[in-house]
A protein has these predicted regions:
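Structured alpha/beta reader/binder surfaces that contact nucleic acids or chromatin modification marks
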Residues: 1-141
Length: 141
């Protein structure tokens, strides 16, 4: 499992399932689960600008400096038809995004292997989520 630090508001948009691609200047061959870490610094793009450009209302305060969720990279392409795609970048195509309980954690640059303690915790939460859905009970994390 990997971990990727992303600035807010983008991290929350991903784990809420709204943003379906993550734009990067570099490609990846990795396919699989990724823990989403919200960086200590928020992006310069304001909540108002996100609402104007993309029609999505954001909370006034978002968690910083910790784990906020998990997603899955299923492809890496350039270009991509998503409204979230930034021209000239590589689009990490994301599926099965969902929030996790916030956990303070130091982030890393690039796409890195997640420490064992994070991987096992996320896999456990991930497995319970899938099991609950199969039984017809949607479980929110």
């Amino acid at each position: 499992m990997k971990i990727l630090s992303i600035r807010q508001s983008w991290a929350s948009l991903i784990v809420s399932g709204v943003k379906d691609v993550e734009n990067r200047t570099w490609p990846t061959r990795y396919r699989g689960p990724v823990i989403i870490h919200a960086s200590l610094r928020a992006d310069d793009v304001s909540s108002e600008e996100i609402e104007l450009r993309f029609g999505v209302r954001m909370p006034s305060e978002l968690p910083l400096g910790g784990i906020v969720g998990i997603t899955e990279i299923v492809d890496c392409v350039r270009p991509h038809p998503s409204k979230w795609y930034a021209v000239g970048h590589y689009a990490f195509v994301l599926k099965n995004s969902r929030p996790l309980p916030f956990a303070k954690w130091k982030g890393t640059q690039l796409l890195r292997d997640a420490p064992d303690e994070l991987s096992s915790c996320s896999i456990s939460i991930n497995s319970r989520s899938r099991l609950s859905r199969k039984r017809g009970r949607a479980k929110r994390n």
